[in-house]
């Protein structure tokens, strides 16, 4: 019996150099037990480049930005051409732009993965010109099946788009199951790690209120953040707090990020909402205790392997981060719980269940 053929399009590999969604599709491409085609002309994606099996022209970030307009048009034309051919069993678009509905041959099924519902839950942070909700709704409504990456995402899909429950499969993300020791960064001896964006529903400002309170009592404590560069308002916030000299920003690659987790007192995740929360698993693999919000999908993913707090209550955050900064017994307990928990989340299992979803569509 011949293997299925699945077609991924260009969208996420055009948008992300690094990032959770492109990592998800990269891992599926590596692990799926089927033929995977990728329609992509030009990319700056790190994962494809590092694999040694990049099916597109790779450009460094700077020339890629200069040529962004023409590249977007070219990648779109490459995907449209491949989709029209129809020589695949399943089409799996890598993001929500419904451009493909005009060129997908009649009768060719597609599956869509929904990674979160933050545009629907927090429209105030995305502006009136935001197209994402309309795009997502159209793409989801016409899909043969939908993959949700958590129970919470499934519930939000039903709530906002009235999707029939039986049309949705829950398939968790995975993570590589080995820690890679690295020691290339010079880091402070004692720090809290914050990973990712800091705007709006990410709830960084509330966390910083708690951190500031603790750092004024513990003069050795630092904060390290990854993600986008500081905004002017953040720099002013740090200056006003009197803690600027103990706050660092690092734009970390995968190896450096591993070291940041490995040497941190704790990783903090104060977000009000996430579709899944890959950094939780990253912390577990790297033996880093986690203090996190008790909202959204976090209890679903972390279970007993986290120090929970109420994300909108600075005092609750303060108590959690204070405990993990000082209580070695609790830190060790959470490190061991995290190592046990993370074994449930492998890319092999993600790929296996995704293949089962494809089979449901083909057999319908």
Language-model regions, residue ranges each:
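Carbohydrate transferase catalytic cores enriched for Leloir-type hexosyltransferases
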Residues: 1-364
């Amino acid at each position: 019996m011949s293997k299925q053929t699945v077609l991924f399009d260009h969208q996420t590999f055009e948008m992300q150099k690094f990032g959770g969604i492109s990592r998800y599709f990269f891992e599926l491409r590596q692990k799926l037990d089927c033929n995977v085609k990728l329609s992509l002309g030009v990319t700056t994606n790190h994962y494809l480049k590092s694999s040694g099996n990049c099916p597109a022209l790779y450009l460094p970030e700077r020339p890629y930005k200069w040529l962004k307009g023409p590249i977007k048009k070219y990648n779109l034309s490459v995907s449209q051409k491949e989709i029209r051919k129809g020589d695949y069993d399943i089409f799996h678009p890598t993001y929500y732009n419904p451009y493909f509905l005009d060129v997908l041959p009649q009768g060719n099924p597609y599956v869509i993965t929904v990674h979160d519902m933050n545009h629907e839950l927090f429209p105030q942070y995305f502006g009136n010109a935001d197209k994402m909700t309309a795009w997502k709704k159209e793409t989801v409504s016409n899909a043969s099946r939908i993959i949700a990456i958590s129970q919470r995402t499934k519930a939000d899909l039903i709530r906002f788009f009235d999707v029939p429950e039986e049309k949705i499969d829950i398939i968790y993300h995975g993570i590589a199951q080995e820690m890679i020791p690295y020691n290339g960064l010079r880091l402070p001896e004692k720090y809290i790690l914050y990973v990712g964006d800091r705007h709006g529903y990410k709830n960084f400002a509330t966390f910083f209120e708690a951190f500031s309170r603790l750092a004024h009592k513990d003069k050795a404590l630092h904060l390290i953040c990854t993600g986008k560069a500081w905004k002017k308002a953040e720099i002013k916030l740090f200056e006003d707090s009197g803690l600027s000299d103990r706050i660092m920003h690092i734009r970390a690659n995968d190896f450096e990020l591993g070291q940041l987790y490995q040497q941190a007192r704790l990783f903090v995740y104060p977000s009000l909402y996430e579709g899944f929360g890959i950094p939780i698993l990253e912390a577990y693999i790297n033996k880093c205790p986690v203090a996190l919000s008790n909202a959204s999908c976090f209890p679903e993913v972390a279970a007993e392997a986290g120090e929970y707090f109420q994300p909108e209550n600075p005092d609750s955050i303060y108590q959690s981060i204070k405990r993990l900064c000082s209580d070695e017994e609790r830190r060790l307990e959470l490190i061991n719980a995290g190592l046990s928990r993370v074994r449930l989340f492998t890319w092999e299992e993600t790929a296996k269940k995704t293949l089962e979803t494809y089979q449901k569509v083909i057999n319908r």
